[in-house]
Design a protein with these regions (language model features):
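Short active-site loop/helix that positions an aromatic residue
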Residues: 79-89
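Long, compositionally biased stretches
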Residues: 2-71, 90-142
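Extended catalytic/binding region for NAD+/ADP-ribose chemistry, centered on the ART fold
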Residues: 73-77
């Protein structure tokens, strides 16, 4: 099982403590059974990151901070959503969109309508749906 071996090696290298685990109480849309993830960085993937499930090596998502393409993205998230994660004015919130890489750069998209919100200080997150944002679940990245 080559995938499992790579998963184990990557997790051991990147996961230095339980403090690095982001807990999603409700899981992600379509993946409600998976609650604990680690956000992995790799220079060869930049500006993307990998959100890897700790419950299954087969569940991982390529993610991107939406501000790379939409400067005002954080303003689109209702304050109550940040507050539900314990984000305050002193806390730096993080948001990510799940990315799908297409056959060409023009075919690559991000789900800007259903971002992942993270309170990195408390290591908790949730996925929400922005119904009135005007953004798409398949927002072109290029």
């Amino acid at each position: 099982m080559k995938a499992m071996q790579a998963y184990d090696q990557t997790t051991q290298l990147k996961l230095k403590s339980k403090d690095a685990i982001i807990h999603f109480d409700e899981g992600l849309i379509g993946f409600s059974d998976f609650k604990d993830f680690v956000l992995m960085e790799n220079d060869s993937l930049a500006p993307f990151r990998l959100l890897q499930s700790l419950e299954s090596p087969q569940v991982g998502f390529l993610v991107l901070e939406p501000t790379a393409l939409a400067n005002n993205y954080y303003d689109l998230v209702p304050a109550r959503e940040w507050e539900s994660l314990g984000v305050t004015k002193k806390t730096k919130p993080l948001a990510f969109v799940i990315v799908v890489i297409g056959n060409t750069p023009q075919g690559s998209t991000g789900n800007f309508q259903a971002p992942l919100l993270v309170n990195y200080e408390k290591m908790v997150g949730k996925q929400i749906i922005l119904t009135d944002s005007g953004l798409s679940v398949r927002q072109p990245l290029v």
